[in-house]
Amino acid sequence: MNIEQFQSMLEEKGITLSSRQLEQFKIYFETLVEWNEKMNLTAITEKEEVYLKHFFDSITAAFYYDFSKPFSICDVGAGAGFPSIPLKICFPHLKVTIVDSLQKRINFLNHLAQKLELSDVAFCHDRAETFGKKEGVRESYDIVMARAVARLSVLSELCLPLVKVGGTFIAMKGAAANEEIENGKYALEVLGGELKEMSTFQLPFEESERNILLIEKKRKTPKKYPRKPGTPNKLPIEK
């Protein structure tokens, strides 16, 4: 996906990028590749691949959810900033918090935010399991997002405790999401969530399947969740 295709395909979806926003994506790409030489941020470094598989793929969430309001967003395990930083570039009014367990990725994100001149962004070096217990952040976000971090039964325990009641958990998945949903339904129920919508589409050019799940937070999450670091992965909430 070259820059012209990136721009026009977003335009088709009603997302018009200014020259400043296009410049921010250019800086993002250059910074990602530069830092990737000294630490492992991504296996994808070829320009057209980054624009497709990182930038465009992250923004696809906005094809199925309206980001036009100044929502507070928490991105769990964002790594090099996906999906929340590409969304922040497109929708500058968003208030973004990224939680990542690796300090060197947080260092990269702090540097990136300076280079992109982003405001209303916060980067927290923490495990989602401990972050989700903290007063002031627990059940405080309009939207919590994660892209391909873990299977749904595990991911729900990391993300739903952070979503305010009435808010949305957006899980961005690859193929075979149906099986994940089936296995994850019980966890959603236990944690206070309900699957509202699942959208399946093909990522352009490479035609690989993507699924975006919109999960509404219906009830408060029981206090015992999230459990201790590592437990959700070892003992997922499944029947």
UniProtKB/Swiss-Prot annotation:
Enzyme class name: transferase
InterPro entries assigned: rRNA_ssu_MeTfrase_G, SAM-dependent_MTases_sf
Major localization listed first in the record, in broad terms: cytoplasm
Keyword set, alphabetical order: Cytoplasm, Methyltransferase, rRNA processing, S-adenosyl-L-methionine, Transferase
Protein's cellular compartments: Cytoplasm
GO molecular function: rRNA (guanine-N7-)-methyltransferase activity
Positions of S-adenosyl-L-methionine binding: 77, 82, 128-129, 147
Pfam families: GidB (PF02527)
Gene Ontology cellular-component annotations: cytosol
EC number: 2.1.1.-
Similarity annotation: Belongs to the methyltransferase superfamily. RNA methyltransferase RsmG family.
PANTHER family, per database record: S-ADENOSYL-L-METHIONINE-DEPENDENT METHYLTRANSFERASES SUPERFAMILY PROTEIN
Function: Specifically methylates the N7 position of guanine in position 535 of 16S rRNA.
Protein name listed in UniProt: Ribosomal RNA small subunit methyltransferase G
Lineage: Bacteria, Bacillati, Bacillota, Bacilli, Bacillales
